[in-house]
Amino acid sequence: MIQRFVIGKPFPTARVVRDLPAETGPVPYLTPDGDGWQYVMQEKDIVYGLGEMPRGLNKRGWHYETNNTDESEHGENRLSYYAAHNFLLISPADGSGCIGVFVDFPGKVSYDIGYTRHDTLRFATAEPNYALYLITAPTAAEVAKEFRQLIGPSYIPPKWAFGLAQSRFGYKTEADIREVAAQYKANGLPLDMICMDIDYMQSYADFTIDKARFPDLGKLAADLKAEGIRLVPIIDAGIRCDDNDPVCREGLEKGYFCTKEDGTPFVAAVWPGRAYFTDFLRPDARAWFGKQYKMLTDLGIEGFWNDMNEPALFYSPERLKAFFENAAALSRKDNLDQNDFFGLVRSVMGLMNAPEDYRSFYHDTAAGRVRHDRVHNLYGGCMTRAAGEAFQTLRPGQRTLLYCRSSIIGAHRWGGIWLGDNHSSWSQLLANIQMMPAVQMCGFLYSGADLCGFSEDTTPDLVLRWLEFGLFTPLMRNHAGAESREQEFYRFTDVLPAIRNMLDLRYALLPYLYSELMKAALEDAPYFRPLAFDYPADPDAREVDDQLLLGEGLMVAPIHTQNAHGRTVYLPEAMKMLRLRSVSDYDEEVLPAGRHYLPCELDEVLLFIRPGHTVPVAQPAANTAQLNDTALTFWRFAPDGQPAPYRMYTDDGVTTVHNRPEHWRIVGQ
């Protein structure tokens, strides 16, 4: 059951697709607490949710803010990342039924989940104008399904988007891109996408191409596509301030940019320096921005990643001027005490994403003129919507790849997400594992992290262990920052055979992974989920937060600690374990329910088949276009000797025609 409660006068956010009447009575389960609400937790209650947030599957024991932030310092003590996923799922230990809470509010929401008081969950919005949805059902899985139905269907990418993407901030020329493609081929590694960061642009300006470094982007895209590889360029939120740029001129002339209180365009700096910011909350401005992608789709580009759309702000001219004045005053001193020195450091860091800057510009909406900070979390999702809506016109009937950094619930209908600028660390691998079910509860099925880590230097063992989890995530992208060690998979020659085997395993499992993603999208089912969703009465399953159920029939238990030669795995029921070194080289063993220490060397991955299930397996291929999903073998666990057929989904992978009877077939009988 879903109940809607209206507090104050909510801003129309378009986050849900069902029009529910507002309840007039008290809110069940929750108690008013000043400017927010509280819920008293029992000792072993679990609180899932909040999507892209730090810490474990169970969010108890910390405080969080959904305030979309360009947060490069990932870690368990952060309060907010790039997304506003205001959904909580409370699973009581006594089995009395589960509760979902969705706070439909476009500004900052604060959560205290046992941080101040161990037994108390509390949340509050920045102002008292929001809609509150309460979902109750017997199980967590049912609550999650009802929530997905409330917020609408998830974006479905093209099938080639399930192949490997190679990316780096630092591919500066066409020759760099061609070299990556050539090296993957020469080393026998599959590849479906190469992502371009801002270096392909002229002076880092959106919707431009640096002709000196990329003289014929259309030919490059066509040449790569002939090899089964798509070129996927980045688009940022800011439009460079440049009177000679026709996009900038048109945006100014037609008033499509956000403005300051006095009505003049708001300016802040990002990669190209000073930039304007499209007012994505306006339908006409969204349509205008969306049509700009045409200059790239006309060149044969079929996929994009949107970035910097929190929006990230490096500095505003006003704050930069104040900083220089302060620095000039300090420059007259030849001896800075700790107050002066650390004050200078704080003033430098305070230039970026300053709250004062977010309070200094406005949006013109159907509900009136509104200051940005009051609707801040809508911005990135509305940019996603601008692109998603445009692709319906620019590429009618075709799927266009789109994934973005900043998001809010509702944006999942237009694109996927990646989990931002993580680090090359073992703790970030664990964070990736634990975030996946949470973001997918919020509808973002096409999602994944930067494999091996974006910033800092990765290591060969971290590359392999991260890949051994990443091969199961819908978005599988190896992405690194400009200052990081080069981490294309072919560079790790000492572990290259194992890397090749793991990439081959990803492609071999695509008949299963693609089918399960499509079931999740078309039937509001989970792709990744905690063990407790399927084993709610098992107290040990409720405690597990580093094993995940994957689709109907699999469980994964990644290794996420360095120098480990195995791990302890909890099985809620008997399962068949596969210890895979490659698609054709593996050990299998039926293990009873309970805890098991299982050896797993660096070149191995553990996979578990649940009883009564079958997994279709294809032959590995160089890319998704070459994958043959009709010549299949099957891994199965049928302990009772009965057939365990698999319901497999197959379509053309490129058009928006989904869920026809001919797309489904029964295999493995």
Summary of predicted features, one role per range:
Residues M1-A161, R168-F169, E174, A181-A186, ...:
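Catalytic and substrate-binding clefts that recognize carbohydrates or anionic sugar/phosphate headgroups
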Residues D33, P190-I499, D534-Y535:
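Aromatic- and carboxylate-enriched substrate-binding clefts and catalytic-loop regions
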Residues M41, S91, F102-F105, I113, ...:
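Glycine-rich, histidine-containing beta strand-loop boundary motifs that form or position
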Residues H63-E65, Y81-A84, R178, R286, ...:
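Short, hydrophobic/amphipathic alpha-helical packing segments
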Residues G75, L378, C382-T400, S407-I417, ...:
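Catalytic core of carbohydrate-active enzymes
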Residues N77-R78, S154-P157, S167-P215, K219-A221:
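A conserved hydrophobic secondary-structure block that centers on an alpha-helix together
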Residues Y82-N86, S96-C98, N129, K159-A161, ...:
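Extracellular structured ligand-interaction cores
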Residues F87, F147, Y184, L224, ...:
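A residue-level signal for conserved active-site and pocket-lining positions in enzyme catalytic cores
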